[in-house]
């Protein structure tokens, strides 16, 4: 088996309470079952890859938060980048794009209205995602995704851009905001983290899983989705969200309602989401 500890667990739509402490739980990822079962662990050889070839160096530092072992970046410092070739404006979107000159990730916050974030699909945020696509292409950003492109970067195209959100309705809303000419097999891909597993693009735009969420659920705090969303890019990743997420994480007390003998996945998810947010906060990477 090839298993990624950061992968998304299978989606199960039936009650699984009776299997929660089973040594061969059918609803858990097979690699995790093998590692936690003493009999299977004894006959399993574990090989850990110590180098990530997809991500830039600072993104590897960020994604390491999701793993129980450390790994390094294959890419040399300064090898990967995204930078505009046209004059930028003083807009917040352009400011976020300029931040990617020296960093590979940035969080763009959209104001939450007096009535709170929309309960249904956040069409305003969907338009923000489309606006980022428009600006990236209008600024004719040049991108380097490997050592071969560092000294000869190429101009970013729609096929270099991917968009990810945890909900299908949001992805549909984003798709409706994008020109049809930019979509399709050889254009921008917009889908869920589950369908992004194993794939990559030069630039990713991700809707933060907690955007619009006031009381995070186990689904919202599941770290596999955030890990996938933060690790699909070769050069740059832009997270977009309503501006309440930091406060939501600070005020939320996760409920430890797991079965006896099982790990506290909700508490761990809250801690990793908080570490992810604070990583950007401490480096002034929240616009």
Residue ranges and their predicted role:
Residues 1-287:
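Conserved helicase motor core of SF1/SF2 NTP-dependent helicases
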């Amino acid at each position: 088996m090839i298993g990624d500890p950061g992968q998304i667990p299978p989606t199960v739509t039936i009650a699984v309470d009776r299997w929660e402490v089973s040594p061969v739980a059918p609803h858990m990822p097979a690699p995790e079952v093998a590692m936690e079962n003493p009999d299977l662990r004894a006959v399993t050889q574990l090989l850990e890859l110590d180098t990530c070839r997809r991500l830039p160096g600072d993104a590897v530092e960020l994604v390491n938060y999701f793993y129980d072992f450390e790994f390094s970046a294959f890419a040399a410092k300064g090898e990967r980048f995204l930078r505009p070739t046209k004059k930028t404006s003083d807009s917040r979107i352009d400011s976020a794009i300029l931040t990617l000159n020296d960093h590979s990730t940035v969080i763009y916050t959209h104001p939450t209205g007096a009535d709170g974030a929309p309960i249904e699909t956040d069409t305003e945020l969907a338009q923000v995602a489309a606006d980022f696509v428009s600006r990236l292409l209008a600024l004719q950003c040049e991108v380097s995704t490997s050592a071969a492109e560092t000294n000869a970067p190429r101009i970013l195209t729609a096929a270099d851009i991917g968009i990810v959100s945890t909900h299908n309705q949001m992805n549909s809303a984003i798709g409706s905001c994008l020109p049809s000419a930019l979509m399709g097999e050889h254009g921008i891909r917009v889908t869920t983290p589950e369908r992004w597993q194993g794939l990559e693009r030069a630039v990713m735009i991700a809707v933060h899983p907690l955007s619009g969420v006031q009381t995070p659920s186990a689904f919202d705090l599941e770290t596999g989705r955030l890990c996938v969303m933060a690790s699909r890019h070769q050069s740059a990743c832009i997270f977009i969200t309503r501006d309440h997420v930091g406060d939501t994480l600070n005020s939320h007390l996760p409920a430890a309602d797991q079965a006896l003998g099982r790990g506290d996945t909700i508490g761990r998810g809250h801690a990793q989401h908080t570490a992810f947010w604070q990583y950007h906060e401490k480096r002034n990477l929240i616009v």
